[in-house]
């Protein structure tokens, strides 16, 4: 129990620190944002809130947002362009619909991938 409480406290601190860093970036009011794994240490609720905020910055304030993500489904949901990397090399760079394809993702991840459509977007899952 003690370790669990410590872990929760550390995750809460990291979550708040991430928000402070994002606020500092936004205060600079640049035309672009470069974010490396901004969803790390965020629960699903806060990760979605952050991605919606970034979408608002793009749509309403004409910001350019470049994000490094390892969660292909967040990329499928929010990105309009994906650069998929494999072994340190560009595997495919194209609009989201061209990248989120079963064959391409199976080659990228080297596991069976199935796609399901939700709200007009493709999402992937695997049970391996």
Task: State the predicted function of each range.
Residues 33-37:
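Catalytic Walker B motif of ABC-type/P-loop ATPase nucleotide-binding domains
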Residues 48-60:
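Helical segment within the ABC ATPase nucleotide-binding domain
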